[in-house]
C-alpha cells in the first residue's frame, strides 16, 4: 500500500486552491492600506466567513465546516502567503472556537459558535497580564462569586483586536471552595459589559489589528459566562493553546512564502550586469536555503495539525511547539533575506516586504517565545531537568 500521509487529499488541495484564488483579490496591498489608515479588514473577514473559511474547523451543527485544525491552518497559511495574515484567525475560530466547541454548554455553543463560524461575531482572547506572560501561574485577574453571578476584576495586556470583538474569552482565577486556593477559570465577557474597558498600545507593527490593554473593573457576569468546569480550566486552556501554536506556525510559513515570492520575482528580472542577479550564487543560495527551511516548517505544522485532529494531545503539543519555533525562525530569515536580495528596493513601500519585518520578528516572541519553546522541548522531549 502506498503511504499518502504527506500528500494532501483532493478535498484539502481544493480548499487550498479556493482560498488562494479568493484571497488574491485582496492581497498585501489591501492589508497594508488598511493598516496605515488604521482601518479594519472588515470586507476580508466578512467574506472569509461567508465562504466558510473562518469556521471550517467548527462543528457542522453550529454552522461550521466540520473539518479540523489542519483545514483551518491551511486557510491561515494561504491568507498569509497572499500577504493578508490576520491575528484574529488565530484567536476567534482557533482558540476560542475550539475551547467552546469542546467544553462549552449547549447554550454557549448555540450562542457563540455560529457567529464565530460565519464571521458575524468576533471573540478576542485575554490571558497575558503585565506581570504574567510566559508564567500563567502569576495571573491575578480574579473571579469571585456574588450569589449566582461572577464578579471579574483584573487587567490584561497585549490583547489583539479587542476593538473588533463583541466578546472576549478571559482567563482568570477563581477560589476553590474547600481550600481557598486560586485556580484558572475561563469566562466569556461581552465587550460592552459595564466595567469593561480598553486602551490601545502603540506598536511598531504594520497591522490592521491593534494591541490593547484591557481593564475589568468588577465586571458582573451571569453564571453561564463560565466556560467548562471550574476545576478543569488548565486542560480546557491548553486545548486552545495547541491550536494557537499551530495557527501561529501556519501564519509564519505563509509570511515566509510571501517574502520569498516577492524576492524571487525581483531577482529573476533585476540586472546589474549582463545576467539577472538571481543567477549569482550569492543571492540564489540564501534564497534556496530559506525555501528549504520554510518547507520543513510547513511539514512540521502539518504534522502538528494532523496529530491534534487525531486526538493525540501530547504528540500535538510537542509538534506544535516545534512547528511554531521552526516557522518563526524560517519566516524571519526569509523576510530578512528578501530585503537583502532586493537592496534598497526591499525597504520601499512599493515592494511591501520591509513592512513584514516586525511581523516576522513577532512570530519569534508570540504566542510563545522561542526560549520557552526550547525549554519545553528540552524538558518534555529530551527529559532534561527544569531550571525554574
UniProtKB/Swiss-Prot annotation:
InterPro entries in UniProt: Acyl-CoA_dehydrogenase, Acyl-CoA_Oxase/DH_mid-dom, Acyl-CoA_Oxase/DH_mid-dom_sf, AcylCo_DH-like_C, AcylCo_DH/oxidase_C, AcylCoA_DH/ox_N, AcylCoA_DH/ox_N_sf, AcylCoA_DH/oxidase_NM_dom_sf
PANTHER family (UniProt xref): DEHYDROGENASE, PUTATIVE (AFU_ORTHOLOGUE AFUA_7G06510)-RELATED, MEDIUM-CHAIN SPECIFIC ACYL-COA DEHYDROGENASE, MITOCHONDRIAL-RELATED
EC number: 1.3.99.-
Cofactor(s) required for function per UniProt: FAD
Family according to the record: Belongs to the acyl-CoA dehydrogenase family.
Catalysed transformations (reactions): a 2,3-saturated acyl-CoA + A = a 2,3-dehydroacyl-CoA + AH2
One GO biological process term: fatty acid beta-oxidation using acyl-CoA dehydrogenase
Protein species of origin: Mycobacterium tuberculosis (strain ATCC 25618 / H37Rv)
Protein name: Acyl-CoA dehydrogenase FadE12
Pfam families per record: Acyl-CoA_dh_1, Acyl-CoA_dh_M, Acyl-CoA_dh_N
Uppermost EC category: oxidoreductase
Sample GO molecular function, one term: flavin adenine dinucleotide binding
This protein's GO CC annotations: cytoplasm; plasma membrane
Annotated function: Has acyl-CoA dehydrogenase activity on a number of substrates. N-octanoyl-CoA is the best tested, but n-lauroyl-CoA, n-palmitoyl-CoA and isovaleryl-CoA were also used.
Keyword entries, A-Z: FAD, Flavoprotein, Oxidoreductase
Keyword Flavoprotein belongs to the record: yes
Top-level lineage group: Bacteria
Amino acid at each position: 500500500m502506498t503511504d499518502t500521509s504527506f500528500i494532501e487529499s483532493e478535498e484539502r488541495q481544493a480548499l487550498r486552491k479556493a482560498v488562494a484564488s479568493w484571497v488574491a483579490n485582496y492581497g498585501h496591498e489591501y492589508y497594508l492600506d488598511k493598516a496605515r489608515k488604521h482601518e479594519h479588514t472588515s470586507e476580508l473577514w466578512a467574506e472569509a466567513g461567508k465562504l466558510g473559511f473562518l469556521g471550517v474547523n467548527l462543528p457542522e451543527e453550529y454552522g461550521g465546516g466540520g473539518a479540523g485544525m489542519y483545514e483551518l491552518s491551511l486557510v491561515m497559511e494561504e491568507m498569509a502567503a497572499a500577504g493578508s495574515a490576520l491575528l484574529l484567525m488565530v484567536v476567534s475560530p482557533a482558540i476560542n472556537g475550539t475551547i467552546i466547541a469542546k467544553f462549552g454548554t449547549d447554550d454557549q455553543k448555540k450562542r457563540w459558535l455560529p457567529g464565530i463560524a460565519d464571521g458575524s461575531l468576533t471573540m478576542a482572547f485575554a490571558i497575558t497580564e503585565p506581570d504574567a506572560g510566559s508564567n500563567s501561574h502569576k495571573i491575578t485577574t480574579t473571579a469571585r462569586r456574588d450569589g449566582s453571578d461572577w464578579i471579574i476584576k483584573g487587567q490584561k495586556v497585549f490583547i489583539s483586536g479587542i476593538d473588533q470583538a463583541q466578546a472576549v474569552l478571559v482567563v482568570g482565577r477563581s477560589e476553590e471552595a474547600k481550600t481557598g486556593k486560586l485556580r484558572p477559570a475561563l469566562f466569556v465577557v461581552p465587550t460592552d459589559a459595564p466595567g469593561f474597558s480598553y486602551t490601545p498600545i502603540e506598536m511598531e507593527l504594520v497591522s490592521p489589528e491593534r494591541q490593547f490593554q484591557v481593564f475589568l473593573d468588577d465586571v458582573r457576569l451571569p453564571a453561564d459566562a463560565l466556560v467548562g468546569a471550574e476545576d478543569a480550566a488548565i486542560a480546557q486552556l491548553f486545548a486552545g493553546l495547541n491550536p494557537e501554536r499551530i495557527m501561529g506556525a501556519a501564519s509564519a510559513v505563509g509570511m515566509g512564502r510571501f517574502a520569498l515570492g516577492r524576492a524571487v520575482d525581483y531577482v529573476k528580472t533585476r540586472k546589474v550586469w549582463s545576467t539577472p542577479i538571481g543567477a549569482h550564487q550569492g543571492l540564489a543560495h540564501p534564497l534556496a536555503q530559506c525555501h528549504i527551511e520554510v518547507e520543513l516548517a510547513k511539514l512540521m505544522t502539518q504534522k502538528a495539525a494532523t496529530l491534534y485532529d487525531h486526538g493525540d494531545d501530547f504528540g500535538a503539543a510537542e509538534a506544535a511547539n516545534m512547528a511554531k519555533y521552526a516557522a518563526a525562525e524560517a519566516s524571519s530569515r526569509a523576510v530578512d533575506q528578501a530585503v537583502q536580495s532586493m537592496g534598497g528596493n526591499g525597504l520601499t513601500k512599493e515592494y511591501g516586504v520591509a513592512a513584514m519585518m516586525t511581523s516576522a520578528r513577532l512570530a519569534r516572541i508570540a504566542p510563545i517565545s522561542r526560549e520557552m519553546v526550547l525549554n519545553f522541548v528540552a524538558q518534555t522531549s529530551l527529559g532534561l531537568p527544569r531550571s525554574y
